[in-house]
Curated annotation (Swiss-Prot):
Segments of skewed composition (Low complexity): 18-27
Effect of substituting D287A: Reduces the maximum current
Entry keyword set: Adaptive immunity, Calcium, Calcium channel, Calcium transport, Calmodulin-binding, Cell membrane, Disease variant, Glycoprotein, Immunity, Ion channel, Ion transport, Membrane, Phosphoprotein, Transmembrane, Transmembrane helix, Transport, Ubl conjugation
Disorder named in the UniProt entry: Immunodeficiency 9: An immune disorder characterized by recurrent infections, impaired activation and proliferative response of T-cells, decreased T-cell production of cytokines, and normal lymphocytes counts and serum immunoglobulin levels. In surviving patients ectodermal dysplasia with anhidrosis and non-progressive myopathy may be observed. Myopathy, tubular aggregate, 2: A rare congenital myopathy characterized by regular arrays of membrane tubules on muscle biopsies without additional histopathological hallmarks. Tubular aggregates in muscle are structures of variable appearance consisting of an outer tubule containing either one or more microtubule-like structures or amorphous material. TAM2 patients have myopathy and pupillary abnormalities.
Result after altering E106D: Markedly decreases store-operated Ca(2+) influx. Increases channel permeability to monovalent cations. Does not affect localization to the cell membrane or STIM1-mediated activation
Alphabetical GO biological process terms: adaptive immune response; calcineurin-NFAT signaling cascade; calcium ion import; calcium ion transmembrane transport; ligand-gated ion channel signaling pathway; mammary gland epithelium development; phospholipase C-activating G protein-coupled receptor signaling pathway; positive regulation of adenylate cyclase activity
Modified residues annotated as Phosphothreonine in this record: T295
Miscellaneous note of the record: In Greek mythology, the 'Orai' are the keepers of the gates of heaven: Eunomia (order or harmony), Dike (justice) and Eirene (peace).
Protein name: Calcium release-activated calcium channel protein 1
Positions of transmembrane segments: 88-105, 120-140, 174-194, 235-255
Phenotype for E106A: Has dominant negative effect. Abolishes store-operated Ca(2+) influx. Does not affect localization to the cell membrane
Pfam family, one: Orai-1
Organ and tissue specificity: Expressed in naive CD4 and CD8 T cells (at protein level). Expressed at similar levels in naive and effector T helper cells.
Record organism: Homo sapiens
Length: 301
């Protein structure tokens, strides 16, 4: 006897899915596509294997490259600063020395007035020293500036080594100090002395007619003794009163500016020393990398 074949499934009755069958496999495939199939708390994939000596060598090369670029940038910054100082010194010195020479030549001395000997000596000495200081600063600027200009116009980073600004640093600072500090103080003193020389002979009082003949000596002495301060003396005293506070303000500002500049340079030096210390530490680690062998990727721990 042959067994009876099984009846075909009816279309009216839906086929039930097997327990844990295709539904489970489909959910697994969907989780695998979305990336959520991994259990929570799984460690991330390990980084690429980089040995500690290789990492130190890479850091060393980066620091060396940055150090070289920073040194070139520092040299170019010093070159541009030196050029700016020389240009400012040359312009200031030419202007102030020319004014002092014109003032000394164009001043009209009254032959009938008895000038104090100290006033004339101070005016002559101040004018001479003022012109000498500014001409010295102008000479330094004229001699050094063309060499710096020739290097700064070359579009090459290594051409900064051909500039004499590093070797002539003291001369550049001296010219800048003579032109902007000492020369300006002497110019303020020159203005005060020029006011005294120019206005001191004026003795005519307001509302009085100009005398047609020279009065006798006794009358002139009596007039001077009874009149008090003349208009010329008042003008000279007024100019001195105005100029002295400005001179003190100029000195205070110069000292404050110098202290601020020195403080800024000191901070920059400390920063460069810290960078050099970091560079020395990396160099020491690179030199002794064979003394402490480490496994790959251990520096990431």
């Amino acid at each position: 006897m042959h067994p009876e074949p099984a009846p075909p499934p009816s279309r009216s009755s839906p086929e039930l899915p097997p327990s844990g069958g295709s539904t489970t496999s489909g959910s697994r495939r969907s989780r695998r596509r979305s990336g959520d199939g991994e259990p929570p708390g799984a460690p991330p994939p390990p980084p690429s294997a980089v040995t500690y000596p290789d990492w130190i060598g890479q850091s060393y090369s980066e620091v060396m490259s940055l150090n070289e670029h920073s040194m070139q940038a520092l040299s170019w910054r010093k070159l541009y600063l030196s050029r700016a100082k020389l240009k400012a010194s040359s312009r200031t010195s030419a202007l102030l020395s020319g004014f002092a020479m014109v003032a000394m030549v164009e001043v009209q001395l009254d032959a009938d007035h008895d000038y104090p000997p100290g006033l004339l000596i101070a005016f002559s000495a101040c004018t001479t020293v003022l012109v000498a200081v500014h001409l010295f600063a102008l000479m330094i600027s004229t001699c050094i500036l063309p060499n710096i200009e020739a290097v700064s116009n070359v579009h090459n980073l290594n051409s900064v080594k051909e500039s004499p600004h590093e070797r002539m640093h003291r001369h550049i600072e001296l010219a800048w100090a003579f032109s902007t500090v000492i020369g300006t103080l002497l110019f303020l003193a020159e203005v005060v002395l020029l006011c005294w020389v120019k206005f001191l002979p004026l003795k005519k009082q307001p509302g009085q007619p100009r005398p047609t003949s020279k009065p006798p000596a006794s009358g002139a002495a009596a007039n001077v003794s009874t009149s008090g301060i003349t208009p010329g003396q008042a003008a000279a005293i007024a100019s001195t009163t105005i100029m002295v506070p400005f001179g003190l303000i100029f000195i205070v500002f110069a000292v404050h500016f110098y202290r601020s500049l020195v403080s800024h340079k000191t901070d920059r030096q400390f920063q460069e020393l810290n960078e050099l210390a970091e560079f020395a530490r990396l160099q020491d680690q690179l030199d002794h990398r064979g003394d402490h062998p480490l496994t790959p990727g251990s520096h990431y721990a």
